Amino acid sequence: MRKIVAIAAFVSACLVAPWAAAAPLQLFPSPVYVTLQGSDSVASLPGGARWNNLDSAHYVAVSPDGRQLLVSSASTENVFIVDAKTGKTLATIAVGAVPQGVEIGPHGWFGLAVSAGTDSVTVIDMRALKPVKKIIVGKTPHNAHFAADGQLAYVTLQGGTGAAVLDMRSLAKTGEIAVPGIHGPHNLDLSADGRVLWVRDLTGSVAAVDLRTRKELALIPVAPGHAGIDVIPGGRYVFTGGIAGHVVDVIDPATFKVVKQVDVGQGPHGVRASRDGRWLYVAVTATNKIAVIDTHSLKVVKQFDTHGKLPFWVAVRGNN
């Protein structure tokens, strides 16, 4: 009887969704992971596996070697470390009230988990599967992003006016970068050369900041509401959604202008490109779909039904 129960539990925790059969392999050069916040699960493409029992799966990051996922919970104070192959939860770590963004460093050693309710970021040893330090970063942090060499990390301060800078050698906050003109610094990314910080806000603006001079280079109006932001590999475009609208904005980083708006359906939030920069995956929250945009033609080439509720964030191996 115990064996039957164990098998049933495994099956319920790791299901293959019907969207797998409809996922052309050429659209997915590397694995893509999507949080289904309303279904307590993370789904993967192109294989179609879905891993359940992840309470209100909110943000997700994948390790550089593709072996681990770091997933935050919108309804508890926890983050989960998950085996990216089997879906097994390897560790559940308490990080404080209102967990938000998560990120794994370029070497795979450290993970970062943001707690908006405690104004902190928890540093996690991804090999030992344990927290190693909690860093107070500023008012209402939201998400984090590592520099390419892993020595620095940046954390948006949604309750402030910019981003905190963390030294990942000393595991300490070393300063803040002002981002004037935006309301609630929300999500972030770095340019391909690491010189420009891109910040998406809560209400419909994107700012670009020169990290050497700390000067704001541009303030760009985009779709309403909050969303993710992605400088695609190669740096040709910057994409951002807008959860209160229905389009993804395409920004030319050379001119800081929106060159196109791509209609994907109501509520686009998470955006992340394939590791080769050819495809953009968009979590469309109100339609429960994943839209795939061709970054050459800037057109939607496929819409996948997630067979889950509230697809929120997207992680792609090779594009952290």
Report each predicted region and the residues it spans:
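Predominantly soluble domains enriched in secretory-pathway, periplasmic, or organellar proteins
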Residues: 10, 14, 18-320
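Bacterial N-terminal signal peptides that target proteins for export
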Residues: 1-8
